[in-house]
């Protein structure tokens, strides 16, 4: 491994430790399959908004995903940060980072290990850390639809703002993700992912998410996406809704070789 690759992975590791979005589940597979022809990729998305007068508010968000591909392995690093204020009061403060290593075994099969940290002060999540591993089965076609299925397990450590105790549990990890190229516009595609993560010792404690994303490629490096997401937590913290619906849209610029 060259010193450039080593530096890239070191930077990802440092950011992972430092970053510590209370989305209990975060879909990263759309980023994993981005730009399949590239061995290295770094994509950044920035969003700044604000208003003054009757409505005084400011918001900023930064997202990045990075890939390092080899013949038998792939590294993925994804992170985001968002903060918002309204009338001089903080209304959002999220941080998230995910690092994943995939070893390919042939026939579309592979093994993966991953680590993740996240926080969201306004959804009472002081910190959530997890470390896990699993098996994946990739049924993607070179120029057609993509299908990926995975099963695994991870250890989760969660600390809520409202509780002194830290919760440590083992969770199962089951997911499926699909990508379908569309002819509606140049380079457009529709992505869908679904995850289910039950507590192994108490299946009544269940987390799940479904994400749909429509992507239009404006140039080789610039794209715009529209995302809808629904997540469910059977045992949310006190004062937090069990169900949550999110939507977002914005441009993304990609550096690749």
Regions found by a protein language model. Give the residues of each.
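Outer-membrane beta-barrel "beta-signal"
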Residues: 243-257
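Cleavable N-terminal export/targeting peptides
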Residues: 1-38, 256-257
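Residues on the lipid-exposed face of transmembrane beta-strands in outer-membrane beta-barrel proteins
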Residues: 48, 62-68, 99-103, 133-137, ...
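Repeated loop/turn-to-beta-strand initiation elements of outer-membrane beta-barrel proteins
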Residues: 72-77, 108-111, 143-147, 182-190, ...
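Solvent-exposed loop/turn segments connecting transmembrane beta-strands
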Residues: 50-59, 86-92, 119-127, 163, ...
